[in-house]
Curated annotation (Swiss-Prot):
GO terms of molecular function: G protein-coupled receptor activity; odorant binding; olfactory receptor activity
CDD domains (alphabetical): 7tmA_OR12D-like (cd15915)
Protein localization: Cell membrane
Purpose of the protein: Odorant receptor.
Ranges in the topological domain labelled Cytoplasmic: 45-52, 119-137, 216-236, 292-307
Name this polypeptide is given: Olfactory receptor 12D2
Gene name linked to the record: OR12D2
GO-annotated biological processes: detection of chemical stimulus involved in sensory perception of smell
Membrane topology listed for this record: Multi-pass membrane protein
């Protein structure tokens, strides 16, 4: 991985420039990180250890929990360190590594939401054929595919970014190493990087988002025209609504961040909006997708009683 940079480290400006807020924000984000890791860790442990949850639906939920633990850990520990530090530096290699894992896990989660929406649509609309359509082989192949695509998507960006020439300011207008603020610091031609960011990352975000919307539209259409039970309709719509809320909270900020041009006027908005999909969504996922589920709560109760 070659680069012609004269910069050996970057300075992360953080969430806010107001020094008086740093201790308070440290406590807030530390609490969020603890809840995220604990909640997702509990879900992952239950899905692995309880034989009653060894089904395809919980296979995807286990993937989501593992993703969210990793996703939070890529950004939050460094953010917490910087809240209490006066020198908010990150090495060049550390910056590129954070960029790679951030985009690898983020794009994988984006595609996983689409897979989970499709899984839910099959479970609701074709329950008798669910085990035939969503067979273990297909689910394993889908999971491996999205992880591999996410890895190579991030590898493309990390390699291309590492080869840029950084000869001026090393102050990143963000709380993490992301592509857009790094491109603002590059001295050379970044047109190819900008095109890859808009085209490839835009496709990775827009494609799964469209497929997710399509799955939920199909579910709602099916429920209104095929379901005669009001209780079943209300329960299914409640499940879809809560899932869809998490999906919107993830996709909307991502699309806002990576679709609009990299202008100086958007930098402050970008780092605030990024909190939604880097910090908030990983906390909500275990609450919305699993801990509201009766089978998961039952499994959690059995684990607690055994302790």
């Amino acid at each position: 991985m070659l680069n012609t940079t004269s910069v050996t480290e970057f300075l992360l400006l953080g969430v806010t420039d107001i020094q008086e807020l740093q201790p308070f924000l440290f406590v807030v984000f530390l609490t969020i990180y603890f809840i995220s890791v604990t909640g997702n860790g509990a879900v992952l442990m239950i899905v692995i250890s309880d034989p009653r949850l060894h089904s395809l639906m919980y296979f995807f939920l286990g993937n989501l929990s593992y993703l969210d633990i990793c996703y939070s850990t890529v950004t939050l520990p460094k953010m917490l360190q910087n809240f209490l530090s006066t020198h908010k530096a990150i090495s060049f290699l550390g910056c590129i590594s954070q960029l790679h894992f951030f985009h690898s896990l983020g794009s994988t989660e984006s595609m996983l939401f689409a897979v989970m929406a499709f899984d839910l649509s099959v479970a609701i609309c074709k329950p008798l054929r669910y085990t035939v359509i969503m067979n273990p082989q297909l689910c394993t192949q889908m999971a491996i595919t999205i992880w591999v695509i996410g890895f190579f998507h991030a590898l493309l960006h990390s390699v291309m970014t590492s080869r840029l020439n950084f000869c001026g300011s090393n102050r990143i207008h963000h709380f993490l190493c992301d592509i857009k603020p790094l491109l603002k610091l590059a001295c050379g031609n970044t047109e190819l990087n900008q095109w890859l960011l808009s085209t490839v990352t835009g496709t990775i975000a827009m494609g799964p988002f469209f497929l997710t919307l399509l799955s939920y539209f199909y579910i709602i259409t099916y429920l209104f025209f095929k379901t005669r039970s009001c209780s079943m309709l209300c329960k299914a719509l409640s499940t879809c609504a809560s899932h869809f809320m998490v999906v919107i909270l993830f996709y909307a900020p991502v699309l806002f961040t990576y679709i609009h041009p990299a202008l100086e006027s958007f930098m402050d908005q970008d780092r605030i909006v990024a909190i939604m999909y880097t910090v908030v969504t990983p906390v909500l996922n275990p609450l919305i997708y699993t801990l509201r589920n009766k089978e998961v709560k039952g499994a959690l109760g059995r684990v607690i009683r055994r302790l």
